[in-house]
């Protein structure tokens, strides 16, 4: 979207127009840092001026952020009751399910080792990389980190196989498969991705 590259100064010019016309701004928190939500919240206030109608669209990922529903309610209270604004949240009415193939996972961009995989263009080098012990150790460290940013919960027990040349694996998650073979869930995922590549189809939920 063009607004992705807009400066906050450009946004402020837009806000003036929207406020004058009593129009509605539909925005979204930054997918990784999320700090821009406070800027939108402040712009909605109606202290000594007309409030701007703001609605924030989010996947409301309760898996990676279990207290997110409290944050949204608190922010709404602050914006509407204390700051006299007109601030609303839009969320999905059902879990945000994404379907994936092999290593083709956009959410890998949210952490260093995953971004490295996303940047690799040579397929042979890609599969060579995920079988390096040092890389796997680094990937596991990033996946299990306590303090993370981004949308993905990084929980491979919620990675469910929907299609695979080995039909016996369909309907199982990577943690279950790892336990069967006595390996970590990440190892199970990388091993299956190496063996089946994009024929390994799986899904996970963001909310």
Predicted segment positions?
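Active-site neighborhoods of metal-dependent hydrolases
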Residues: 3-16, 24, 28-207
